[in-house]
């Protein structure tokens, strides 16, 4: 278990919901991954991300799914790809990742409360 953080620290993490518009295999990645283009609504716009989620997802199955992503981390260069947000998920006992998705449709750009 990690150290406690303050409410103020938690509020600094900007987690928003967005809809995956496009997904493709990240062929250049060292570990199997999928590149995604995600719509976070008018205010935030479109952002790109990469995630190692191939154990449970293929690119075609991701299009149209809403995901929760951290949008205020610095951009990160991953090989030839620039990731602009961090798609969130839950690590399973085997190390695979299950995406964090809203149970019901949410407005793109809505902030996690």
Task: Specify the residue positions occupied by each region the protein language model found.
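Phosphate-backbone binding interfaces of nucleic-acid-interacting proteins
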Residues: 1-113
